[in-house]
UniProtKB/Swiss-Prot annotation:
The record marks 93 as: Determines ion selectivity. Keywords: Membrane, Mitochondrion, Mitochondrion inner membrane, Transmembrane, Transmembrane helix. InterPro entries: Mpv17_PMP22. GO terms for biological process: developmental pigmentation; iridophore differentiation; liver development; regulation of mitochondrial DNA metabolic process; regulation of mitochondrion organization; regulation of skeletal muscle fiber development; regulation of triglyceride metabolic process; UDP biosynthetic process. This is Mitochondrial inner membrane protein Mpv17. The gene is mpv17.
Length: 177
């Protein structure tokens, strides 16, 4: 395991942006597999591989770039590594970024699932508030720790590891029709 971590660190040093995006996409996919297998109990025979591929593409092309970029912006908006700075970053993240990101994530998923604009709006109206409240149960303490203890170039990976559970929930929520 230590060798794997060292390899990951070396790749992060050489290609931080690519590695962050690949990590995010892969872990969004893992979240969908967990959602389908453990939450929805589909079984391997009924696993929707196309859905997993869609979720991974959202991770590669939306989650990874957007969250990775957001952390860079946030580090410029709120500087420092103190507890106070970590708290401020968490507040800006959870009040400013999370609501927008979550709405976009659910909307993108609905679009990729073939929902019409009207169906997507109805789904957002039905699911958004519940998902946002669930977000607030999980993410504030994770983000305070992330912003205080974790270097910028590892934040997306740390969040995505925790997010395997979150992604499982989001995949279930986003794909529940």
């Amino acid at each position: 395991m230590a060798g794997l971590w060292r390899s990951y660190q070396a790749l992060m040093a050489k290609h931080p942006w690519k590695v962050q995006i690949i990590t995010a996409g892969s872990l969004v996919g893992v979240g969908d597999v967990i959602s389908q297998q453990l939450i929805e109990r589909r079984g391997l025979a009924n696993h929707n591989a196309r859905r997993t591929a869609k979720m991974m593409s959202i991770g590669f092309f939306f989650v990874g770039p957007v969250v990775g970029g957001w952390y860079k912006v946030l580090d410029k908006l709120v500087t420092g590594g103190t507890k106070s700075a970590a708290l401020k970053k968490m507040l800006v993240d959870q009040v400013g970024f999370a609501p927008c990101f979550l709405g976009a994530f659910l909307g993108i998923t609905g679009t990729l699932n073939g929902l019409t604009v009207e169906e997507n709006v109805a789904k957002l109206q039905r699911d958004y508030t519940d998902a946002l409240i669930s977000n607030y149960y999980l993410w504030p303490p994770v983000q305070i720790a992330n912003f205080y203890f974790i270097p910028l170039h590892h934040r997306l990976a740390v969040v995505q590891i925790v997010a395997v559970v979150w992604n499982s929930y989001l995949s279930w929520k986003a794909n529940k029709m």
